[in-house]
Amino acid sequence: MEAVAKFDFTASGEDELSFHTGDVLKILSNQEEWFKAELGSQEGYVPKNFIDIQFPKWFHEGLSRHQAENLLMGKEVGFFIIRASQSSPGDFSISVRHEDDVQHFKVMRDNKGNYFLWTEKFPSLNKLVDYYRTNSISRQKQIFLRDRTREDQGHRGNSLDRRSQGGPHLSGAVGEEIRPSMNRKLSDHPPTLPLQQHQHQPQPPQYAPAPQQLQQPPQQRYLQHHHFHQERRGGSLDINDGHCGTGLGSEMNAALMHRRHTDPVQLQAAGRVRWARALYDFEALEDDELGFHSGEVVEVLDSSNPSWWTGRLHNKLGLFPANYVAPMTR
């Protein structure tokens, strides 16, 4: 989501984010009187009453995976919502009504802050939504995002035309005006800061600990429930409620889609041998995978793929997720 700064704000704590009037901030998460936001390459907390934001009707921050399914099953194909990830603060998931069910995709971000599901990348969620209104979000079927019934769709154009004359809008939203007028009176004064500001800094929400302290890896990128169909393996899947998705990004999706048809023996000579220590337990769910426990040392035979490596342990050869291990010298 995007928001526009109504006033200048100077950070007084290390976890706060400074900005100027008119700056456009990306909103990452919500906590009482503060938002976690991003501006440029910086992230931090900003007071809600210093910015202007109106969430599009398709954004439901607190909705769970199960609630999203219940909401969308009664809708037409293509209806969707975007919600905050319950297991990964600051991330988002998109739930889409397909013909037979509701599918959930993890919205990924690259190191430049762009959002993506497949190969196309966008500077904001609104741009992503706008793109998939006219381009299929599914790689198997033609499914376009929509939040209006076919009956209402005919009235949409006129409504948007009228709105477009009233001021700037956030690209990709469904007609809701969410940017404030830039004609703010010069006599306006910044509001009082939320209480946390007078306590030196806002209290951040509980985030996941560092990877080495986790029982399970952060932003798990392995599909544990292998009954999902092939399209879900190809996209970036939601990991909420214990369901882990690939989340591999545009550079890695193709590799993951074809890796199930790759014989690990054929990969043995592709890379040099080295060693890696397991950071987490990994359960092999398919014959071509290599299971291990945290702390075990795996012989790495091929590390050319950024997401899945080939290794050997206890005389067994197979594939395993690269982010479950740490390279080591031996």
UniProtKB/Swiss-Prot annotation:
**Keyword annotations:** Acetylation, Cytoplasm, Endosome, Nucleus, Phosphoprotein, Repeat, SH2 domain, SH3 domain
> Could you confirm whether the keyword Phosphoprotein appears in this record?
yes
Task: Enumerate the subcellular locations listed in this protein's record, separating them with semicolons.
Answer: Nucleus; Cytoplasm; Endosome
Q: What is its main location?
A: nucleus
Where composition is biased (Basic and acidic residues), the residues are 144-164
All copies of the SH3 domain together span 1-56, 271-330
User: Could you tell me which residues belong to the region Disordered?
Assistant: 143-244
**InterPro entries linked to this entry:** GRAP2_C_SH3 (IPR035646), Grb2-like (IPR043539), SH2 (IPR000980), SH2_dom_sf (IPR036860), SH3-like_dom_sf (IPR036028), SH3_domain (IPR001452)
Alphabetical list of Pfam families matching this protein = SH2 (PF00017), SH3_1 (PF00018)
Q: Name one GO biological process term.
A: regulation of MAPK cascade
Read off the Gene3D superfamilies from this record.
Answer: SH2 domain, SH3 Domains
List, alphabetically, the GO terms of the cellular component aspect.
cytoplasm; cytosol; endosome; nucleoplasm; nucleus; plasma membrane
Sequence positions bearing N6-acetyllysine = 106
**Does this UniProt record's set of keywords contain Transmembrane helix?**
no
SMART domains in UniProt = SH2, SH3
Taxonomically, the superkingdom here is Eukaryota
Regions annotated as coiled coil: none
Q: PTM Phosphothreonine: at which residues?
A: 262
- What does the protein in this record do? Interacts with SLP-76 to regulate NF-AT activation. Binds to tyrosine-phosphorylated shc.
So what family is this one in? Belongs to the GRB2/sem-5/DRK family.
Q: How does it assemble?
A: Interacts with phosphorylated LIME1 upon TCR activation. Interacts with phosphorylated LAT and LAX1 upon TCR activation. Interacts with SHB. Interacts with PTPN23.
What protein name is recorded for this chain?
A: GRB2-related adapter protein 2
**Upper lineage ranks?**
Eukaryota, Metazoa, Chordata, Craniata, Vertebrata
